[in-house]
Design a protein with these regions (language model features):
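Short, low-complexity disordered leader/linker segments with a strong preference
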Residues: 1-35
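Ligand-binding clefts/hinges and TM-proximal coupling segments of bilobed small-molecule sensing domains
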Residues: 24-26, 73, 149-167, 202-208, ...
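Extracytoplasmic small-molecule ligand-binding "clamshell" domains
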Residues: 30-99
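Periplasmic-binding protein-like
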Residues: 42, 117-125, 192-234, 251
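Extended ligand-binding regions for polar small-molecule ligands
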Residues: 60-69, 128, 141, 146-149, ...
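Acidic, polar ligand-binding/catalytic clefts
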Residues: 68, 73-136, 202-203, 207-208
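Short helix-initiation/N-cap motifs at beta->coil->alpha
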Residues: 75-87, 129, 146-149, 164-178, ...
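A ligand-binding cleft/hinge motif common to bilobed small-molecule-binding domains
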Residues: 100-108, 153-155, 182-211
Length: 251
């Protein structure tokens, strides 16, 4: 059996002033770029989320640190997950960083940086559920976040008729709590962050199905930016800065 791997445009919220539909600013010939636009989906704790109107999370802090190393400001564009790659392809953002798994299909549309984090797809069910593993999920309603690898591979394994898709995964948890779906497939750290807040309602199954590599997506052919991002990631790995950020959010 294939292992699990980890739409309408959502409202756009920008740190700073970015006009709707505006492309990422290109510097004048010979001028240094002073700002990069990062698109993300801030509904994916602990990687990206909003707290009191402020963007926080592993990806947010990593992106800001990369910006510091490159000597540029990083501006955040908050959009639906399935709009991230099209936004990078169109030039409306310089890069996407959103707990995004590297897949062969996605590599046809964008270029990916070096891996900065790995994750595991996991299954979450109601605390009193009889579901113990993947073999019990056939014929059940399964919730996923639209456009994620969980969506892609669950659709393949269980059929489209079994899927319930949500632009915000937290909406899936609310649906499961009210009995509308039977299980959710989501990245393990996201599952932990949500279940910790409501352990009386949900439980995470012990079986892990696959590891996934997270990386930053840039427009195909933008080797200059990709090389700079890769250098920053490599430095953050070697000097412990990346681990410090991850450890801050994942205990």
């Amino acid at each position: 059996m294939k292992k699990f791997l980890s739409l309408t445009l959502a409202s756009i919220m920008v740190l700073g002033l970015v006009a709707c539909g505006q492309k990422a600013a290109a510097p004048a010939s010979g001028a240094a770029q002073t700002k990069l636009i990062m698109c993300t989906n801030a509904e994916f704790p602990p990687y990206e989320f909003k707290d009191g109107g402020e963007f926080k999370g592993i990806d947010v802090e990593c992106a800001k640190l990369i910006g510091e190393k490159l000597g540029v400001e990083v501006e955040i564009l908050d959009i639906a997950f399935d709009s991230l790659i099209p936004t990078v392809m169109s030039g409306k953002a310089d890069f996407a960083m959103a707990g995004m798994t590297v897949t062969e299909d996605r590599k046809e549309s964008v270029d990916f940086s070096h891996t900065y984090q790995t994750a595991v797809q996991t299954i979450v069910v109601p605390v009193d559920s009889a579901i113990q593993g993947v073999e019990d999920m056939y014929g059940k309603k399964i919730g996923v976040q639209t456009g994620t690898t969980g969506d892609i591979y669950c659709s393949d394994d269980f059929g489209d008729e079994s899927m319930e898709r949500y632009s915000k995964i937290i909406d899936g948890f609310q649906a499961m709590k009210s009995g509308k779906i039977d299980a959710i497939v989501v990245d393990d750290q996201v599952a932990k962050a949500i279940v910790e807040q409501d352990a009386s309602s949900f439980k995470i199954l012990e079986t892990a199905y696959a590891e996934e590599d997270y990386a930053i997506a840039v427009k195909k052919g933008n080797s200059d930016l990709l090389n700079k991002i890769n250098s920053a990631i490599d430095e953050m790995k070697s000097n412990g800065q990346l681990k410090a950020i991850v450890d801050k959010y994942i205990k």
